[in-house]
C-alpha cells in the first residue's frame, strides 16, 4: 500500500450508498468497492443473487443490506429508496447501474414490444430511482447521483438500447442543471 493510500481516510466512510443492478457485473464491483472504501451499501437488484453480494460484503467486514425490487416501475424504485431511508435514515449517494442490451440486430427488425422492453430495462430504472431519491436529497441540500451509461449510445444493431442510454445521458445533464442550487 502506498503512503498516499495509507494516509487518507476511506472515500466512502460514513456514507450511505444505494447501488442498483448490484447482483452482478459492474454493479457488484461498485458495491464491493464502495464497501471496501468504508461505505454502507444498500444493494438493489431484482435478482435474489443480490443477497449473496451483501453476504460477501458483510463477511469481509463491510456494512450492507440487500433489497430485491423491480426498478422498471416507480413503485419499485420508491420502495427501494424508502427501505434504504428506513434502515439507514439517509442516502448520500445513488449509483444507477441497471440496464443491458437484450437483443442485437438491425433496428428495422425490432418489434414494438422489443423496443419498449429495451427502453424499460435501460432507461426507466435510472429515471425512477432519480425521481424517488431527489426529494430527500433536495430537502437536505446535498447528494450525489451517478448514472452509468454506455459508449453504445453510438453503435449499430442496438438502437433501442442506444436510445435508452442516450436518455440516461440527457437525464443526467438535465438533473445536474436543475439541481445545481441544491448541492446535488
Predicted stretch roles:
Residues 130, 164:
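Active-site helix of classical SDR
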Residues 60-63, 83-94, 102-103:
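A glycine-rich helix->loop->beta "capping" turn
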Residues 86, 101-116, 139, 157-160:
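Conserved mid-core segment of classical short-chain dehydrogenase/reductases
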Residues 150:
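Residue(s) in the substrate-gating loop at a strand-loop-helix junction
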Residues 51, 68-80, 112:
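The beta1-alpha1 cofactor-binding region of Rossmann-like NAD(H)/NADP(H)-dependent oxidoreductases
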Residues 92, 108-127, 142, 146, ...:
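Catalytic Tyr-X3-Lys loop
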Residues 135, 177-181:
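Alpha-helical segment proximal to the catalytic Tyr-Lys
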Residues 9-42:
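Canonical Rossmann dinucleotide-binding motif of NAD(H)/NADP(H)-dependent dehydrogenases/reductases
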